């Protein structure tokens, strides 16, 4: 809950503080690099705690960091409040939360009970109904949770849709690759944490490059090729087997994926806040974060279904492998999921290609105008 409050607030503060697009791009680059560094520390620390203490320690390790950040925020972050109607959209909150829960749980149930299960169908139908009601509410309430003017602008709407698809394709990669490293290759939790460092290093390095290029070339020339590169990196992961080497088959994929995703994340953050008013920056930032998280949840649930089905089918068709069948079946399930993940990233590239129509000139003009 508190992370959901923090992430949009951080992006909103950057947006209203850095009004010059070149400076804002650098600020987003710094955020990207810090996030990458934090991810590296988290993977290693989480692996160490899991291996040498208990996984429960991972749930409390953020407490001292959060306390320190809160103290610094009180000292350095200036308070700001939205003007006008500040009432809270309770009906919107209820229908949106229930709708997204039903959608995610419906995909989850499909993995265990199948798409024809009455429970799966019931949750998915309920999700559609609740989300339609949510949109109807947002059109009528005075202070909507999600003002439609924020998402109906072409570039912002495309950014949120692209973020949803990218989250669906990327988040599941970490799940399946982590399982491959630990279950198939036998990596310890700590070693698995170190194994993801190439991805982190790629994000840190290319986030700085993306922040420098964004004001010069605009967002689309970075995001579309970036997603294509990331998709290629995912496709390279389909070469893995229970006997392949981490250095030759996993590291190159992680480096290609991370370089591509860094070229996406920085411009995507900028386009998601394109031409938005100060009053709506918090909502626009929250939409970006929400679309990523919802995409990750839906993608993980959906691709878990895909991987489980592929694993079961392979095991049934190759029973002659005996005791070796499960490692090969699980790896096959992972590779099928990676193919679907790559397809989602390619779909994201198509979405951003057709929706994003701002160049470097309009990025400067519209963003400069909206904050002065």
Language-model regions: role of each:
Residues 1-91, 118, 201, 278:
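Helix-loop-helix hairpins in multi-pass membrane proteins, especially solute transporters
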Residues 8, 35-47, 51, 100, ...:
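Glycine/proline-centered helix-kink
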Residues 15-18, 74-78, 107, 135-140, ...:
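Structural signal for the C-terminal ends of transmembrane alpha-helices
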Residues 61, 105, 118-130, 139-313, ...:
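12-transmembrane solute porter fold
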Residues 69, 312-324:
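Peri-membrane helix termini and adjoining interfacial loops of integral membrane proteins
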Residues 70-97, 139-154, 215-216, 363-368:
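Flexible interhelical linker loops that connect adjacent transmembrane helices
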Residues 81-82, 97-120, 135-137:
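Phenylalanine-glycine-rich, low-complexity intrinsically disordered regions
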Residues 82, 322-327, 355-372:
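Intrinsic disorder in cytosolic terminal tails and internal cytosolic loops
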